[in-house]
Design a protein with these regions (language model features):
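A mid-sequence, solvent-exposed acidic-amphipathic segment
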Residues: 12-13, 34
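Right-handed parallel beta-helix/beta-solenoid
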Residues: 15-16, 42
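Glycine-rich hexapeptide-repeat left-handed beta-helix
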Residues: 26-103
Length: 103
């Protein structure tokens, strides 16, 4: 976790698999997972969140996701495992998809 990161009441599991860039804000009740159980097997994969991102309240970031610098993940959005969010994009929904590019 780099300097200037603000984390509200997030749940971050598997800290050794999670990187969060400078100036990112993680909203309350957001969940960031480096692992999950799938079909009786454990899946482990790193999560990389870039600089100056915003992860909304109650969003869920699953294993293997990468979020580019300045991207926004809307409140309650769920990123499926191994999702790549390019820099500067806004994603939302369940499952999350691109809504628009940030201004």
């Amino acid at each position: 976790i780099e300097k200037g990161v603000r984390i509200n009441t997030a749940r971050i599991w598997d800290m050794s698999l999670i990187s969060i860039g400078k100036g990112t804000v993680i909203g309350g009740r957001a969940v960031i997972l480096g692992h999950l159980a799938e079909k009786g097997e454990m899946v482990f994969a790193p999560v990389k969140i870039g600089k100056k991102c915003l992860i909304g309240t109650s969003a869920q970031i699953n294993p293997g996701c990468t979020i580019g610098d300045g991207a926004v993940i809307a409140s309650r959005a769920v990123l499926k495992k191994y999702t790549h969010v390019p820099a500067g994009e806004i994603w939302g929904g369940i499952p999350a998809k691109k809504i628009k590019e940030s201004d």
